[in-house]
């Protein structure tokens, strides 16, 4: 047993843990990252979700998430605009290599792969060390970045698992009492992703064999409402490959999901989930033809990935975890938009100074925007809406994560940074998404490094110091306040981020900051910095603009060799283009600079000009 010491120990190499370790090390902390698998990145890579959701608007592409998109664009010449479920689809291998390269570039970051936590030592309510099969690591600060919050159970840190009734948090969508759904599916269903491949017309892919438990009737009608092509193109990847993460009678698996809490029973659940996906892939091949088979060269094979590897992700895509009982709990109403607004209220805490002075402090440290999305094999549930039309399409309304939700209520020297933060079951449907978890991890890593610098506990850390460190990071500055009209490249970005941190009561309900009148203007519509990280080549597309309804646009293509005469949905992720679309006259002839996504039937506009 090798004994190691560090300033910061990050347990788990998933989405949040990878970001946390990178950020802590970049800040200068001696950091050890211990991962169960040979790939870093979790949901974004080893779990196969190479079509991330949320934070797609340019103004929300900040921090490590924004840097990841930029690096994907640089390394994937085919661009990122392939499927229709996301604006960013990529080869999982490319994503994993990006994270590995970033880690390798940090000499004060020691990465150990192939180890899972087995014991946690807690002395006087303080986590002191974590034991793995071959190592014991003692650190000043420990970050639980495991997929299922395993350190919480091992260290007997108070946590939640499953549904809360409406009486607990007064959440509008929470159940009034237990019901068959809450009892059968205590948490959201995981999905074991598989990547399939089109071998080409006239080609025959190897047969996908039946798993030990095969019941194709479970998938009856899975894509009837979509058609074969649209079903496959949902998660289309480069190279005629398809991410299979299908929510409608597909490969979500939640039977006996409570078994994940038991190390002894977890393997049984994992086997069933893996077989469930294999059965679905076999059905796809049988119904759509033998030109479709497994993409067997995606994930590493062997060792820790005994159930996964090849075409199958190394582990399931976990949507929910054990969740710490933190200094505050993020609830459904905390992520819903303000009345007559399109952003959630900022999280406010009262900071007392002595007996007479107190002030309201905004402790936002990460930004998300995904709609509240819950997955249960039995189907959708009724949820309070948190979506809006923007840029010609539906998107989620922005919200923030409070720092206090990363800090356990009683336990010191510990932070959460995955889906294990202090959040209700209902709100978890929006906080679990990959870009936001990167942001949570980045904040946790920075907080841990600052605690080492300040020689303080996470609960004692000055949150304004943390926010300033995140905003001013020299490599990947990240937003803590969602501003829909201001990308991080804008010269006013830092000013308005700090302005609303200092004056949270002034935060606008529409998420739009005013233009300053100090001689500094926001970026122009033609600024190259406003081009999102989605494509490798842009096209000039001419056509007739049509407005079907509010924020619902099309373009009848008039001059394009490949697309002439076609009607494409016209969408954008750019604030300036969004504003132009709002005022463009129907039947106007326009030139659009953008990329065409044949899977989604849309033209993603980076700039638009009337002609």
Provide a role label for each language-model segment:
Residues 17:
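N-terminal Rossmann-fold NAD(P) dinucleotide-binding loop
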Residues 533-551:
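Structural detector for short beta-strands of small beta-barrel domains
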Residues 121-136:
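Conserved beta-strand-loop-beta-strand element in the redox core of flavoprotein oxidoreductases
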Residues 549-573:
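OB-fold (S1/OB) nucleic-acid-binding surfaces
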Residues 23, 29-30, 34-119, 160, ...:
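Conserved N-terminal/central alpha/beta ligand/cofactor-binding core
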Residues 43, 113, 135-141, 145-530, ...:
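Flavin (FAD/FMN)-binding glycine-rich loop and adjacent Rossmann-like elements that form
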Residues 2-14:
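Beta1/beta-strand and adjacent pyrophosphate-binding region of the FAD-binding site
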């Amino acid at each position: 047993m090798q004994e190691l010491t560090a300033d910061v120990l990050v347990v788990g190499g998933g989405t949040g843990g990878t970001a946390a370790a990178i950020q802590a090390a970049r800040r200068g902390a001696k950091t050890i990252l211990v991962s169960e698998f040979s790939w870093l990145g979790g949901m974004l890579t080893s779990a196969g979700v190479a079509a991330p959701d949320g934070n797609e608007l340019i103004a929300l592409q900040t921090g490590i998430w924004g840097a990841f998109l930029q690096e994907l664009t640089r390394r994937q010449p085919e661009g990122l605009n392939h499927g229709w479920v996301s604006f960013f689809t990529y080869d999982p291998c490319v994503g994993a290599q990006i994270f590995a390269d970033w880690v390798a570039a940090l000499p004060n970051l020691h990465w150990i792969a192939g180890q899972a936590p087995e014991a946690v030592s807690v002395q006087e309510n303080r986590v002191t060390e974590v034991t793995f099969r071959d190592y014991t690591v003692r650190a000043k600060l420990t970050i639980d970045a495991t997929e299922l919050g395993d350190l919480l159970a091992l260290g007997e840190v108070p946590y939640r698992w499953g549904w809360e009734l409406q009486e607990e948090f007064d959440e509008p969508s929470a159940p009034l009492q237990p019901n068959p759904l809450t009892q059968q599916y205590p948490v959201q269903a995981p999905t074991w992703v598989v990547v399939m491949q089109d071998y080409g017309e006239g080609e025959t892919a190897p047969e996908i064999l039946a798993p030990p438990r095969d019941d194709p009737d479970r998938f009856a009608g899975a894509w009837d409402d979509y058609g074969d092509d649209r079903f496959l193109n949902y998660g289309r990847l480069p190279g005629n490959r398809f991410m299979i993460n299908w929510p409608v009678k597909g490969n979500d698996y939640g039977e006996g999901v409570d078994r994940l809490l038991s190390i002894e029973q977890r393997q049984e659940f994992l086997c069933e989930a893996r077989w469930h996906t294999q059965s679905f892939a076999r059905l796809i091949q049988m119904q759509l033809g033998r030109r479709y088979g497994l993409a067997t060269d995606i994930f590493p094979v062997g060792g820790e990935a005994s159930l996964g590897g090849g075409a199958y992700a190394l582990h399931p895509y976990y949507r929910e975890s054990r969740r710490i009982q933190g200094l505050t709990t993020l609830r459904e109403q905390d992520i819903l938009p303000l009345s007559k607004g399109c952003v959630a209220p900022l999280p406010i805490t009262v900071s007392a100074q002595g007996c007479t002075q107190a002030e309201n402090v905004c402790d936002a440290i990460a930004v998300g925007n995904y709609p509240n999305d819950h997955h249960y094999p039995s189907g959708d549930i009724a949820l309070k809406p948190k979506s809006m039309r923007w840029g010609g399409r539906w998107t989620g309304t922005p919200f923030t994560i409070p720092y206090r939700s990363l800090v356990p209520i009683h336990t010191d020297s510990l932070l959460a940074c995955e889906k294990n933060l202090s959040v209700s079951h209902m709100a978890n449907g929006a906080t679990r998404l990959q870009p936001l978890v990167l942001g949570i991890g980045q904040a946790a890593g920075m907080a841990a490094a600052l605690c080492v610098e300040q020689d303080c506990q996470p609960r004692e850390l000055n949150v304004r110091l943390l926010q300033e460190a995140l905003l001013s990071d020299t490599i990947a500055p990240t937003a803590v306040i969602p501003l829909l009209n201001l990308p991080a490249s804008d010269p006013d970005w830092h000013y308005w981020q700090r302005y609303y941190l200092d004056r949270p009561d002034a935060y606008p309900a529409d998420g739009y900051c005013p233009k300053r009148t100090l001689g500094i203007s926001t970026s122009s519509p033609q600024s190259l910095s406003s081009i999102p990280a989605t494509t490798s080549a842009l096209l000039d597309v001419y056509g007739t603009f049509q407005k079907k309804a509010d924020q619902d646009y099309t373009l009848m293509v008039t001059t394009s060799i490949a697309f002439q005469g076609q009607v494409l949905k016209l969408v954008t992720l750019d604030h300036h283009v969004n504003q132009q679309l709002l005022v463009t006259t129907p039947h106007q002839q326009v030139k659009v600079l953008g990329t065409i996504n044949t899977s989604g039937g849309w033209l993603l506009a980076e700039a638009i000009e009337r002609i």
